Amino acid sequence: MSNKAEATNQSSFFNLHVEGVGYLNRVRRVKPKKGQEFLACTVSAMRGSTDDIAYTKFDCKVSGAEAQKIVKMLEADVAAEKTVIIGFKIADIYPEMFTFEKGDRKGELGVSIKGRLL
């Protein structure tokens, strides 16, 4: 019975984390209309065979203290278009629809995978 009582008194969360290795891109500061400015980036995660690597892009808000420190440290290298590979952990991923505003796909719908870089 004590386990049931303990479970009732504790907050429960379902955590979804993605861990891997990928390229760090598009380091930027985002200024929303409401709320505070935050650091963001794109991670192109590598997956599949090393002979035929595929990539999945994640658009991330940089949340973790260590992630903030590391991304800020690597920001100049990303801006200089150097290849920057990182180990990462992304939490709370979700899809977000958007409309392409320019290029060959202008007006088409797309999907971005959002998350928090820890």
Model region roles, listed by residue range:
Residues 1-118:
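Single-stranded nucleic acid-binding surfaces, predominantly the OB-fold ssDNA-binding core
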